[in-house]
């Protein structure tokens, strides 16, 4: 375990840790939270992350924050798949190695980062959580974000043996305990999974997806418009049949959305359970109930939600950061 920062404090404020949870594209909410902290002058001393939370924390400490955000903002769901690379033969649909080489030149050993940092992953052989606090920062993020079925498991050297590691969300989606082990005296956690609705289109019983057929005449302009309109009846029938076929296929959960929803449900339940065991001083739970974990092109919305969630708990955050009186304690007294 990376030794806690033993450098003398420059003030009487407590050493503040940030536990950034898993959530794939919903990780943009972390960016909104960090933007709020920066605006208020809140200094984070310790970063502990799971999956996308680990990547966000590493990007801050590797000094690639702005280029990382610019790159990530350019991604759509399709772009993300292309960036990572498809590989069906090695234990996952996506091979993430290609994406992680993008910032390889900026990678550093975790021991050389300016502040304590660690990522949490899950040992595929034992099911235990593993704290990655040494070696390549990007390799730690790669292991921490290896979502089962989606991203290939990561082979990682732990001590003197190699282990196959998968997403930390399978064991500890919001690593509050890791932040404290790294030396944090106060911890702010950001949980992206507790308030999620995995498949919102199935949230009412006895309903199926309804896909309205588009207007068959829409976009029929130019010299071929009269001919197209003459065959309007046949075209309407074709459009209607296509819409019905699509609705029928989506009236039941599809393979990958079922896998993603299952992961969301398990991580959400696990995050709630662990929140009672590893208690954060401030727990932020952005309402991402309508957010897909693959909605990379919704970064502005997710970032806004994270920012607004932090704003709603501003006084609590400032208090634990030592920048304002602790209202809860004064009330108790």
Residue ranges: model-predicted function:
Residues 1-50, 58-333:
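Patatin-like phospholipase
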């Amino acid at each position: 375990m990376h030794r806690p920062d033993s450098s003398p404090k420059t003030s009487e404020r407590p050493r503040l840790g940030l536990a950034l949870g898993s959530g794939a594209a919903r990780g943009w909410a972390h960016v909104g939270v960090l933007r709020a902290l920066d605006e208020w002058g809140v200094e984070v001393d310790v970063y502990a992350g799971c999956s996308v939370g680990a990547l966000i924390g590493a990007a801050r400490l590797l000094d690639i924050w702005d280029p990382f955000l610019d790159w990530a903002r350019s991604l759509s769901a399709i772009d993300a798949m292309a960036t990572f690379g498809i590989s069906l033969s090695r234990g996952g649909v996506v091979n993430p190695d290609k994406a992680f080489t993008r910032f390889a030149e900026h990678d550093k050993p975790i021991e050389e980062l300016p502040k304590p940092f660690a990522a949490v992953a899950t040992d595929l052989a034992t099911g235990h959580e593993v704290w990655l606090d040494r070696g390549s920062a990007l390799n730690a993020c790669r292991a921490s974000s290896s979502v089962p079925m989606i991203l290939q498991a990561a082979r990682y050297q732990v001590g003197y043996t190699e282990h196959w590691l998968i997403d930390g969300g399978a064991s500890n989606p919001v690593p509050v305990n890791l932040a404290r082990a790294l030396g944090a005296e106060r911890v702010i956690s950001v949980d992206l999974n507790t308030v999620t609705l995995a498949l919102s289109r199935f949230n009412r019983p006895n309903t199926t997806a309804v896909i309205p057929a588009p207007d068959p005449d829409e976009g029929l302009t130019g010299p071929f418009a009269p001919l197209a309109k003459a065959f309007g009846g046949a075209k309407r029938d074709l459009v209607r049949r296509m819409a019905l076929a699509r609705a029928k296929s989506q009236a039941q959960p599809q393979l990958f959305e079922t896998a993603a929803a299952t992961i969301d449900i398990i991580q959400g339940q696990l995050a709630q359970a662990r929140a009672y065991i590893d208690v954060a001083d401030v727990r932020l739970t952005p309402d991402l109930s309508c957010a897909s974990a693959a909605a990379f092109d919704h970064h502005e919305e997710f970032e806004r939600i994270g920012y607004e969630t932090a704003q709603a708990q501003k006084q609590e955050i400032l208090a634990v950061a030592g920048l304002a009186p602790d209202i809860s304690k004064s009330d108790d007294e």
